[in-house]
Amino acid sequence: ITQGNFDLKELDIYAVGKKGKDALQRAGCKISLDCSDICEEPTYADAAALGRRVLTSFAQGEVGEIWLAYTSFINTVVHEPRLIRLLPVSKEDVDEKVEREGSAGLKLQMNFEAEEESILEMLIPKYMISMIYGGLLEAAASENGARMQAMDSATGNAEEMLEDLTLLYNRARQGAI
């Protein structure tokens, strides 16, 4: 967020996670909502509540765009920061995603008879909530991976220190004999 083309003073940030919130505050961002309590064990209900709040702000014109920033889980060692625009959806964003992920093998399976507007009114909230929930889960997985890596490193360091201390103890004991 701090490296993007954003006016940090104009952002309404709904922060999930203490470290991210603290870093954004240090960078001069205004935190509109602190949701740090949901980051440990995120639930779909938490994502739905946050999604509804964000959508209400968007629908009332309080915000012009909605972006989701989160840590993407690649594996236990690698985590990548991601920033994606959720709303408004642009044709360029869709084309880029289709190009990146491919559309081979996709075929039309049904025709919609409902009005486009009513379909979008139903789908956009579900899309928003699922993207927020996915971001929460990926961030939680990334944090757990980082914790596992840190514990593994600490265990290795402790074992190495124990070997060194055992060697020193044995040398001192041999010297005393």
Predicted regions and their residues:
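C-terminal beta-strand-loop-alpha-helix "lid" module of Rossmann-like NAD(P)-dependent dehydrogenases
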Residues: 1-177
